[in-house]
Amino acid sequence: MIYSSSHIQNSIASHKSSLSPNFPQRIFTRREVIPARNDVLWRIERGAVRTLTWSEDGTFITLGYWGPGDLIGYPLSRVKPYQIECLTSVEVSVVPPHHWNQDVNALMIHIQQAEELLSIVHRKPISLRLWQFLVWLSEKFGRDVEQGKLIELNVTHQEMAEVLNTTRVTVTRLLQQFEDEGNLLRHKRRIILRLSKYSN
């Protein structure tokens, strides 16, 4: 049987309250790196992180963005180097190996989201790539407001460029273009998407 993302998310939510209190919890500050441990996975209870690597010349490559309910950890990747950076204050539960089989749904979500982001990164032109990345962020970290969909996670232009394999200057120019066209609004360093006004 194939389950939809919404079904899986609901399943995670229904089990989260019974599972999480049994596990040790840790709190990390913004920009702190979650320790590289191969013997645990981390379930995010609050906050947001990004997973990333970097090339030989030091260029950062963002691999994913993760929020509450997501399961993250070094055992989930074979990429080297690999780092989990906190974008906000983050609270996680420490999930030991003998409980990983209880988190199959969360692991499925992890795979689905990684593939979604990978497909976005290869979209052309770059304007479509950026717009679909913003839509993806709004679905994961957004909420409905009167003007549209507010992305509550503050992602810098440089961080967007690192995800989308482009330059910060290009991201800044395209965001200004989207704003001029009425497709997005700025609100206290956050972005509001006006999804109905943009045609893919």
Regions found by a protein language model. Name each.
Residues 1-30, 37-40, 67-72, 77:
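Cyclic nucleotide-binding regulatory module and flanking cytosolic helices
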Residues 105-166:
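Polybasic "coupling" helices that flank or enter modular domains
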Residues 141-200:
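Phosphate-/nucleic-acid-contacting segments
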Residues 39-56, 67-69:
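Glycine- and acidic-residue-biased ligand/ion/polar-headgroup-sensing regions
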Residues 61-116:
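Cyclic-nucleotide recognition modules
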Residues 42, 84, 183-184:
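A structural signal for short hydrophobic beta-strand segments in well-ordered beta-sheet cores
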